[in-house]
Amino acid sequence: MNLSNLWQSCLLQLQDQVSASDLSTWLRPLQADVVADNHIVLYASNMFVKGWVETHYLAQIQQICQTLAQNPELRISLKEGVKPAPKIVESTPNTSLRSESAVDFQAESSASVKFESHLNTKHLFDNFVEGKSNQLARAVGQKLAQAPGEPSANPFFLYGGTGLGKTHLLHAIGNGILADKPNARVLYIHANNFMQHMVKAVRDNKMDQFKKFYRSLDALLVDDIQFFAEKEKTQEEFFHIFNSLFETGRQIILTSDRYPKEIEKIEERLKSRFGWGLTTAIEPPDLETRVAILLKKAEEHNMNLPEEVAFFIAQRLRTNVRELEGALNRVKAMQDFKGGDIDIDFVRDTLKDILALQERLVTIENIQKVVAEYYRIKVSDLKSKSRARSVTRPRQIAMALAKELTNRSLPEIGRAFDRDHTTVLNACREVPKFREQDNSIQEDWANLIRTLSA
C-alpha cells in the first residue's frame, strides 16, 4: 500500500474500534507525513493531543498501519506542531513548546516570609476518580501539572455544576506543580477570598503590595470565578493581574459553575480572555463512575461496601460527587453506631429520607417542564405526534434525561410521552450519538443536567 494513503485507510479501520467522539476529537485532526520508507510522523496540534494519543491510541495505530502496509518494521511516531509544507524539506514546525514559552520556575534563595499556597494536600490526581464525565479535564490537568504555562491551555477554564470535582482537580494541579517545582509560587484562592483580600488592601492602603503579590505568582488558581459578577473594581484589578500573568507565561486556572459566555454581569473583555486558552466541562458522573467513586471513598474510610450496595446507591443518587460522599458518610456513621454488615436493606433504611427527596425532586413531569422551557416549546408539544425537528430533538433529549435521572422503566417513561418503550429506547441510543457529534447538543445536555440537579 502507498504510505501516503495509509493514514486515511487506518482511520477507516479505527471507525469500527473507537467512539465517534474520540475519532473526531483526537484522531481525525492528526496530520500524517511520510518521512522515510519505514517511518510516518503524525502531527498533533498541541501537547495535550499528542500526549493523549500516545497514551491511548499509538500502539493501536501502529498495529493497524503495520498490518495494512504488510510491513512489521513500519514505525509511527508523534510530534507536536503542523505538518511541514511538502517543498520545504528541512523546515521545522513552528510550535508552542514548553521550552520556549512555559513557566520556568526559579527557586527563591532568600525568601524572608514563607509563601502559603492554600492548597489542600489531600486532593491529588491519585484519589480523583476518572470517568467519561471528567476524562479530558483530568488529562489536561495532569499535563499542566507537568508543564504549567503551556499556551494552548492558558488560561485553563474548568466549568460544571456544584460538587462534580472542579475544586479537587484545581488542588490536584497545584499539588502536582509543587511536587515537581517545590519553590514555585502557586496560589489557590476562592473568588470571594480574592475580593476580601483586595478590600483589605484598599482599606489598609496596600494596593501596591497587593498588585505585586499577585503579579509575582507562577500559577494562579481561582475557584468559582462567577462570584466576580457585579464587582466592577474587582474585575478591573483582576483584568490587569490576568494580563500581567498571561503576558509572562504564568499559568492561570479558573473554575465556574457555567460556561464563560453564560456568566452574567462579568465584563466582556474578561469573558473573552477566559476563552483564550482551553475551556473544558466536568459533567455529572455516569453510573459506572459513581460506583467507582463510592468504592474508592469506602476504601479510604476502611468500609466494607459490597459492590451491589454501591450500585444501589449510585442508581438513586445521580447529581454530583458531594451528594455521594454525604450519603456514604451517613452510612458509615450509622454502621459505627449500630454495627452489623452493610447491605441494601441497611442502606435503604439509613438513606430513606435522602432517597425519598431525590424521587420528589427529579420526576418525569419536572424534566418535561424544564426541557420545554429550555427549548421554548410547550409540554404538550413533547407529547404530540409532531415530527418537526424543533420538537423531536427536545423530545428525545427529555426521554434520555428521564432514563438518566429517574428510576422509571422504559414503558413508564414512554407512557409519560404518549409513546411506547421502543421509542424511548431509541432516544436513549440516539442522544449520546448526537452529543458526540454536535457540541451544541452536548452543551444543551450539560445545561439541562445542571438545571435539574440544582
Swiss-Prot record:
Subcellular location, principal: cytoplasm
Keywords: ATP-binding, Cytoplasm, DNA replication, DNA-binding, Lipid-binding, Nucleotide-binding
Any Pfam family matching the protein: Bac_DnaA
Superkingdom of origin: Bacteria
Subcellular location: Cytoplasm
Function in brief: Plays an essential role in the initiation and regulation of chromosomal replication. ATP-DnaA binds to the origin of replication (oriC) to initiate formation of the DNA replication initiation complex once per cell cycle. Binds the DnaA box (a 9 base pair repeat at the origin) and separates the double-stranded (ds)DNA. Forms a right-handed helical filament on oriC DNA; dsDNA binds to the exterior of the filament while single-stranded (ss)DNA is stabiized in the filament's interior.
Annotated family: Belongs to the DnaA family.
Record note on quaternary structure: Oligomerizes as a right-handed, spiral filament on DNA at oriC.
Protein name as annotated: Chromosomal replication initiator protein DnaA
Phylogenetic lineage: Bacteria, Pseudomonadati, Pseudomonadota, Gammaproteobacteria, Pasteurellales
Gene name of this polypeptide: dnaA
